[in-house]
Amino acid sequence: MYYCYLRAKRNELLAIRDCAEKIKSANISIILEPVRKNLTELITCFNSILDSDDSSNLVYILNPIVGDLSNNQFDIIEQANQITKQFHNITLGIIVDQRTDYSQVEYWISLFPGNSFVLIHFGEIPNPNTINNIPQIISNIFYSGHVSDNYISLFTKNKILLEDCFNRLNRNYDYQHSMVEFFSDRHLNYRNYGFQGFANFSTIGDYYAEGGTQPYTTAFHLTFNNEQNAVINIRHWLSDPRTYREPISILNEELLEDIYNMINQNSSLLAWSSACNELVQYHNLNNYSYSLGTLKRLSVRHHFELMAHLKDIGIY
C-alpha cells in the first residue's frame, strides 16, 4: 500500500480533493500533518476522501513538528476534537523520536480512546517493546535514515517505510544539471524488506516553509514510470535562467512550452493524468497567469495519479 505524507497547506489539500476518487479506488493512504488552524479546509478535504463507515485511508497527525501548530497544544487538541466528532473512526498519528517518553504516547491515546493510532518514527523511541503492547496502535511508520534496521525489527505490528525521494536543491536553477533523476523503486520491493507499505513526501520532499520570495527561475517536477524497469523517475522543467525577477506569467510561458512539448510526445499521459490535461488547457488558452502554488498542486496531483495508474496496471 502506498502512503503519501503531506503538510496540510492549501494547495496540498486541493491536490487531495482533486484526486479523491483515484486515491480511494487505488487504496492510497494520506498521512496529513496539520500546520495551521484551518478546520474548514481540512473538513472539506476529509469529506472528499473519507467514507462515513471507513476512515482508514487517512492518518491525521496529533503532534505536528512544523508550522503554527507545532507549539500550540491547545489549538491542536481543539481542532482534533472537532475532526474526531465528525469522523469518528479516523486514524490518528503520533510523531515519536528519541525524546519521546512512553507516557506521552499514553497521553495522546487517552484523549481519543475510541480511535486507532499510527506511530511515525522520526527517531528511536526508548524502550520500544512497551509500544507493542498498546492495542490501539495498529501500524508503525519508520522514517528511513532516522532509525536503524535493528530498531525496526523490534516492532511486531504493521510496518511502513517512509522515504524522502525528492532531491531538493537550494535554487530552482540548479536542477538544470540533472533534469531527469531517479525517484523511487520502493513500490517494487517494499515487501521484500518486510514492510506492508511504503511512503514518501510526494514531489515536495520533507520540506516546509511559509511563503517565500518570487524566484528568478520557476520549476515544475513530474514523476513518471520507466517503462523498461518500472522504477519511478522525476523530471524537472525550468523557465529560462535569468539574474533578475520578471512577472510569473512570463516565467510560466517559458516553462509551459517545454512541458507541453513533452506531453505531446507522450500523449498516453492524457489518458490518466488530469494534471497533464490541465497543463495542456493552460497552453492552448495561452493562460500563464497561474500561481506557483498551482504548479505545486498539479505536480502533487499528478503523482497521486501516477501511483493510482501503476496500481491499476498491476505494477505494485
Can you annotate each of these PLM segments?
Residues 30:
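Conserved, mostly hydrophobic/aromatic
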Residues 11, 34-40, 64-69, 97-103, ...:
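Short acidic, S/G/P-rich loop/turn micro-motifs used as interaction or catalytic elements
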Residues 48-113:
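A broadly used, surface-exposed interaction patch
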Residues 102-137:
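Internal, conserved structured core segments that host functional sites
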Residues 268-316:
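Hydrophobic, glycine-enriched assembly/anchoring segments
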Residues 129-278:
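Long, charge-rich C-terminal accessory regions
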Residues 1-26:
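N-terminal basic/disordered segments at the start of proteins
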